């Protein structure tokens, strides 16, 4: 049946740019990719996009810890993420970043529209402040007991146990994640999105029947408890977009993160030179379909805040949210100590991508159920289904076709009724792919695979091959087997892209959904090559051990300037203003008799001479080389009496010590006596 081509935009939740992709992430990206590949097979116009979620205090602090800029860190992480997704053959049309000009412009546009429409409210709030670090604490940097369900060790914005959202100030016994200190309250003006104004619209959207039943039920609980205004601002220091006309205030990461879907699509349109599609997809009355694949932990943001923000800024709402559960490994939460917290890149060092794609797909449904990756069952299922049932069907027939018939298939089907049984299944299997009942689709396909192998077993081509005068029968039987293999691989094409490529090369034809209605008759196939290898538990053991070793390596002490010499406690501007830094000319430099560490420097401050002892001898074995250089000194440091004389200040140098000491110098043009400001 010919379908009307649809315009579809599909997104996955944006991975946070401060960590590697792991098998928990991959469930969502594989689920979405299988669905997208099926839609493309049916002739629909699909744009599949994602991006890194690149803002927030965690990224700012981790970059500081690594001694690099946030921009450098998120750039490196983006490359790593894209490499992982490419390794799993996730067919994104575009992968972008929320730290982009497109996202900045769209965030400011949506904010300005919300403000113009009266949906942004200002008020002063009491906020948790870390007295040791001298900074306001973002939601995720406060932990305590959930005020709703009383679960301990929950973040300051939402509870991972009951799903409730709340203010960090509502936490019971809060602690700073940064320092462990008990936060104190300080006042700060913040901006709030008036979510309650959209309650009626959101309830109507919930009752529309589009959302998963579990999502709709959860939303109803939130409506009954009452929607609250949403704090969309954060105080400096913060890595993100500064709010227009609000110095020192930044958009909360959860405001610009979902807008990143729009930013990535805008970036894709611009790359294509397409000035039309963005508005066509995102305008209020768009006929394009918009689907977000997300995990159950972020339903609140996507089912309430996001559609309300879009409604309030005159953009279209999502067609639907496709929500999935978590991944467990061997029936337990992923564990670093047990080696079951497995990174995507580590997996690909031990197994191919198709194996995990198949296993996840076989277990997925349209419900929000957790998926267990049982590693022993994984090995058994991949070998039983992919190797023994599907690939074996091709291999046990291809040899005869290649050797006895020069690769040419029979001109007629040996069993047209059986072939029709296979092609008639397209409707049921297609509906299962469409409705995300992936496990059902796989069960239907494997039932057909059993039927195909039973046919070959009953026809016994290996026996027929030994009987004189039965060449035509042999060709017909094996051609039938290969045609059934072709149908199976067509149904599995959304799941197994690499195996599909090898199957298409052997079959000498592209696998298309509608193409199976016409069997391959009198068609020449290519010489058969091994399509897929068996896997075993030794690979699993190596994978688990490698994951354990990675955890050990990650737990090793972090090295680098900031790790070796952490930043001191925060001081006020008034404290810093007391330090008088001046440019000084080194008029003379010489060794200090009786000291193997000091040099005596004679400094000219532009009308005043100073004598300074500096512990830089190990880095400057030839003091004469310093004469004539400009440097920076602390000019108002109290004179210090030493056994070699009086030191009248301090010169500024950087480095860990020893030979690695580097005297600081001002830029060209600075003159002795100039104050450093």
Swiss-Prot record:
Q: Which residue ranges traverse the bilayer?
A: none
Q: Where is this motif: 'KMSKS' region?
A: 333-337
Highest taxon of the lineage: Bacteria
Annotated protein name in UniProt: Methionine--tRNA ligase
Write out the residues that bind ATP: 336
Physiological role: Is required not only for elongation of protein synthesis but also for the initiation of all mRNA translation through initiator tRNA(fMet) aminoacylation.
All residue ranges annotated as the tRNA-binding domain in the record: 575-677
Q: Subunit notes for this chain?
A: Homodimer.
The root-end lineage is: Bacteria, Pseudomonadati, Pseudomonadota, Gammaproteobacteria, Enterobacterales
